[in-house]
Swiss-Prot record:
This is UPF0246 protein LPC_0782. Pfam families: H2O2_YaaD (PF03883). Belongs to the UPF0246 family. Transmembrane segments: none annotated. One of its GO terms (cellular component) is cytosol. It comes from Legionella pneumophila (strain Corby).
Length: 257
C-alpha cells in the first residue's frame, strides 16, 4: 500500500544540518522549472498569486530568490517528513519514529506537493510555499494540475506496481488529491475521512481531521499495515471505524463527544 498526505504551509525553521541519509526528490527537474518561473515573480505578484499578506509574500519572495537550483544537500534543505510542521504533521509526530519506521515509510508514504509534485519522506527539499490549487501559468497550462497531473499519476502507478498490496490510501486534502488522474491510475483508491459526532450530528472539522490523518499515517507506518481490515482497527484519540457510513472506497471514522 502507498499512503498519500498533503504538505503543510507551516515549515520547520532549519537551524542545523540533517546528518542521516536522505534522497533527492524524484521529480526535481520538473520542480526546478517551476522554481525558475517563481524566481521571476515580484513580492506583489507572489502576494496576489497565493493571497498572502505582505510579510508572507516577502518571506516567500526571499525563499525563491535564494532557492539553490542545484539542490546542494548542504544548502538549507531538509527531509520533507521533518520540514513540514502543520496539523497533519503534528499527528504524524515523525520525531518520535524509529529509524526502521522512517525507512519503511520511504517506500510506503508519499506527500503531494505543488512545487515538487510527489515527495518521499526523506526527499531533501528547500523551504517553499506553492499550493497545488494556485493558478500559476506554466508550459503545460494555466495551473499546477495541468503541470503535474500526468506526471504524478505516472509516478504513483510506478510505485504502486512495486507494492505487495497495490492500493492507494488517500489521506490528502481534496485540493491536493485532485492532481491524481483517477481514470489513469491503474490501482484501487481508498479514501479515509474523520468526523466528529455531537448530539447525533456528524461534522468534519478541518483542524481535527488533519491531525487525525497524520495519526492514521503514523499508525500505518509504525505497524506496517498492509490491508484494509487492519486500517479499520485504528482507534487512536477516540476515533472508531463506522461500517454504516463507509464503503469499499471510503473508510469513515467517527469520534463521539
Amino acid at each position: 500500500m502507498l499512503t498519500l498526505l498533503s504538505p503543510a504551509k507551516k515549515l520547520l525553521s532549519i537551524s542545523k544540518h540533517y546528518s542521516k541519509e536522505t534522497s533527492n526528490p524524484l521529480l526535481l527537474d520538473k520542480a526546478l522549472q517551476l522554481v525558475k518561473i517563481m524566481k521571476l515573480k515580484s513580492v506583489e505578484q507572489i502576494a496576489d498569486l497565493m493571497d498572502l499578506s505582505r510579510q508572507l509574500a516577502e518571506l516567500n519572495y526571499e525563499r525563491y530568490q535564494n532557492f539553490d537550483l542545484k539542490n546542494n544537500p548542504m544548502n538549507h534543505s531538509y527531509p520533507a517528513l521533518f520540514l513540514f510542521q502543520g496539523d497533519v504533521y503534528q499527528g504524524l509526530n515523525a520525531n518520535s519514529w524509529k529509524d526502521e519506521e522512517i525507512e519503511y515509510a520511504q517506500s510506503h508514504l508519499g506527500i503531494l506537493s505543488g512545487l515538487y509534485g510527489f515527495l518521499r519522506p526523506l526527499d531533501r527539499i528547500q523551504p517553499y510555499r506553492l499550493e497545488m490549487g494556485v493558478n500559476l501559468e506554466n508550459p503545460a497550462g494555466k495551473n499546477l494540475y495541468a503541470f503535474w497531473s500526468k506526471i504524478v499519476t505516472n509516478i504513483l502507478n510506478q510505485i504502486l506496481a512495486e507494492q505487495s498490496n497495490p492500493v492507494l490510501i488517500n489521506l490528502a486534502s481534496t485540493e491536493y488529491f485532485k492532481v491524481v488522474d483517477e481514470k489513469k491510475l491503474s490501482y484501487p483508491i481508498v479514501t479515509i475521512n474523520f468526523y466528529e459526532q455531537k448530539n447525533s450530528e456528524l461534522k468534519m472539522i478541518g483542524i481535527l481531521a488533519k491531525k487525525a490523518r497524520g495519526m492514521m499515517a503514523k499508525y500505518i507506518m509504525q505497524n506496517r499495515i498492509d490491508s484494509i481490515e487492519q486500517i479499520k482497527e485504528f482507534s487512536e484519540s477516540g476515533y472508531l471505524f463506522n461500517k454504516e457510513i463507509s464503503s469499499p472506497n471510503s473508510l469513515n471514522f467517527i469520534r463521539i463527544h
